[in-house]
Amino acid sequence: MEDIRVLIVDDSALMRNLIGKIVDATPGLKIADKAMNGRFALQKLERVAPDVIVLDLEMPEMNGIEFLRELKKQNIKIPVVILSSIAKEGAKVTMDCLELGACDFITKPSGSESANLTTVSETLSKMLLAYGRRHQIETGTRSTDTTNSFSEPFKSTIPKPMTAAEPQKEEKPTPQREHGNIQIIAIGISTGGPNALRQVFASIDKDLPQPIVVVQHMPPGFTKEFALSLDKICPLEVKEAEDGDLIKPGRILIAPGGKHLVVEKRSLAAVAKVIDTEPQSGHKPSVDVLFGSVAKEYQNHALGIIMTGMGKDGAENITKLYTEGSRTIGQDEGSSVVYGMPRVAWEMGGVMEQVSLDNMAAAINRYGKEFA
């Protein structure tokens, strides 16, 4: 399998050099070329044929937004990962980029750390590998592999074939009680999530009987804009969760970046609790924290869904949801950008059914109505 070719687009020579070092140090990646703005990047596209693009937002002559608009206009389908500032205005522009077709984003370290990309180098490397490999496979240009996703984790410095998941444990967990009716839907998702959730929520039925609570791994300052962007395309209300928000049908609550989201059933209603405790499974918000609270409060009356993402956050407690008697779904390998979280959940025996991204909204609508 050939190396993934990365086009680096940033007006800062220092940043181009730093990103280039990350690419050079990552087995399976190679620099296709570098460009100082969107206009030069467009001129290079046909010649260098990148598999993935790293794009800065603020550049002279043609900025990141203008570059993405031009890609869309010319129907050029190359995955783009945005390098975004953490400033509030950066969050709005980043969400605009996702709406224009960017695949994902990563935040630059701020202030005195702005020139130190080592804090995000591993995440950036894995994103570029995942999106670049997927592009190679979908275009059929450099790979004969039939798997669309990038399987987590790496276990050596040599890029592994993207193998299928291990079979489920022979001794699967046993539900402690029969499935009850579904009263809440909980979704955990990470890398590949922004576009996946856009696709799913655009097709959710407006009369879905259950509320939805979501953890999407995302830094502080971005989840509010992310929720607003989803709200534009979803028939249901989508908002960033605030402490005390009612959990009710017709509403989707997104965990705020940098905080955990848990659910709490009271005598007359269920409410969201936003808590500021330590990261769990390496994340904050954590899917495991949300799923654990849903398992505790709803037992066998939930639908848990674990989707594309690196690592294993959510795998442990979606298995707990399953043993409590709730129904569970995992995104399948073929449609996951990174088959990490859903793979571990499947191998642990915590997932009843694997569903493709294209069929996920229909599955949610079907489960929600059939088992209301």
Curated annotation (Swiss-Prot):
Posttranslational mods: Phosphorylated by CheA. Phosphorylation of the N-terminal regulatory domain activates the methylesterase activity.
Residue ranges, annotated region (Disordered): 140-177
Positions of the Response regulatory domain: 5-123
Record-level Gene Ontology MF annotations: phosphorelay response regulator activity; protein-glutamate methylesterase activity; protein-glutamine glutaminase activity
Keyword annotations: Chemotaxis, Cytoplasm, Hydrolase, Phosphoprotein
Ranges of biased composition (kind: Basic and acidic residues): 167-177
Major location category of this protein: cytoplasm
Entry-linked PANTHER family: PROTEIN-GLUTAMATE METHYLESTERASE/PROTEIN-GLUTAMINE GLUTAMINASE (PTHR42872), PROTEIN-GLUTAMATE METHYLESTERASE_PROTEIN-GLUTAMINE GLUTAMINASE 1 (PTHR42872:SF3)
Family label: Belongs to the CheB family.
Entry's free-text remark on domains: Contains a C-terminal catalytic domain, and an N-terminal region which modulates catalytic activity.
Purpose: Involved in chemotaxis. Part of a chemotaxis signal transduction system that modulates chemotaxis in response to various stimuli. Catalyzes the demethylation of specific methylglutamate residues introduced into the chemoreceptors (methyl-accepting chemotaxis proteins or MCP) by CheR. Also mediates the irreversible deamidation of specific glutamine residues to glutamic acid.
Protein name stated in the entry: Protein-glutamate methylesterase/protein-glutamine glutaminase
Gene that this sequence comes from: cheB
